[in-house]
């Protein structure tokens, strides 16, 4: 709608993926137990110190791109990772070879130079860190480089050639809140607690909270002045 409105990372438009993926994995575990008997298993969605990208690469799901994200030939990098630990042996697929080649689009496009070398992101320079995890004020040197992102950042994915043919998800819980798609720049400027609760009721944006989001919006306004 409003092309000047602040931007959200695409994963944040629908329900929080932590809840959706955990529910899906628990349902899968129920099915496996019904089929195979009483097997032991636990599911994790960002809730344990598991090197998920490394294990995903080893399992043949994709390769780790220069933007540090897992990339699949079929899906690009627009997908989530979650894990299920089981006490049964499963035969994995073979690891996938790197297909980034000489491409450096993600490195060249990052406005804060957060990708310090291929496959290595300095989190303390990443727009996603500043707009989601940071609890203080946005540093002055960062203002002017946020590229209109108020929550997260997708730049290194948007420029990736492997995402050219990415398709929308079929999962209805990841569909955007209807009100969210119509919000204008002025709507975001005047964001109230009631609107925030309505639009982001089950959203990962709750991690930043209303005050954090308004801080980010103020920083973006200062960029444009």
Model-predicted regions and their roles:
Residues 24, 28, 106, 213-216:
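Alpha-helical packing segments of well-folded alpha/beta enzyme cores
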Residues 130, 134-151, 181-206:
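Short Fe-S-cluster ligation motifs
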């Amino acid at each position: 709608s409003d092309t000047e409105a602040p931007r959200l990372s695409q994963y944040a438009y629908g329900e929080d993926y932590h809840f959706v993926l955990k529910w899906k994995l628990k349902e899968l575990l129920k099915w496996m137990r019904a089929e195979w008997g009483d097997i032991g298993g636990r599911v994790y969605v960002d809730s344990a110190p598991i090197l998920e990208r490394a294990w995903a690469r080893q399992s043949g799901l994709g390769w780790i791109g220069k933007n540090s994200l897992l990339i699949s030939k079929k899906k690009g990098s627009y997908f989530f990772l979650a894990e299920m630990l089981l006490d049964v042996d499963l035969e994995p697929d073979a690891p996938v070879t790197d297909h980034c080649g000489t491409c450096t689009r993600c490195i060249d496009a990052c406005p804060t130079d957060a990708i310090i070398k291929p496959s290595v992101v300095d989190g303390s320079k990443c727009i996603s860190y500043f707009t989601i995890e940071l609890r203080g004020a946005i540093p002055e040197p960062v203002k002017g480089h946020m590229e209109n992102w108020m929550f997260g950042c997708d730049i290194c994915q948007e420029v990736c050639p492997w995402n050219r043919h990415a398709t929308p998800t079929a999962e209805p819980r990841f569909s955007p809140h209807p009100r969210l798609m119509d919000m204008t720049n002025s709507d975001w400027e005047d964001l109230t607690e009631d609107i925030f609760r309505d639009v982001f009721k089950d959203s990962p944006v709750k991690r930043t909270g209303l005050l954090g989001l308004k801080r980010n919006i103020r920083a973006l306004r200062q960029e444009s002045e």
